[in-house]
Amino acid sequence: LYDILSEGWDVVLIDSMAEVQNAIVDTHKGWMSSKKAETELLNLFEKHNLGENDANVNTAFLVIQQVTKGGEFAGSNRFKHMMTGMAHMEWTKEGERTFYFSKNRRGGDMSVRLFSLQNRNRVGWQGTLGVES
């Protein structure tokens, strides 16, 4: 992971934080706790986000995080704090797909958007929840 990231990437997708964190713990055969692995990952993300890699590229990380059965965020408060934004994809009771931000340090629209994946190779945005489209 360290070697690959050192090349410098515009965007890196992590699916999921828990899987990567557990892989690091497993690789270190018991001498690294889950909390320490999370700290290592967050420090690595921050380093590359600041462009501290061979290409001096400011890397954006899109990190998929699991939720509890109740739909609550399943990570640590430090993880939540270190993120620039937190987006959610959920189903409505009517079966529609939604996308919204609960945190966005860069500002912007925080409304709940409806979308469809019916068209091949294209996301169909269908309006904003609660607003006529």
Feature-to-residue mapping (PLM):
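C-terminal regions of RecA-like/P-loop NTPase motor modules
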Residues: 7-8, 52-60, 92-133
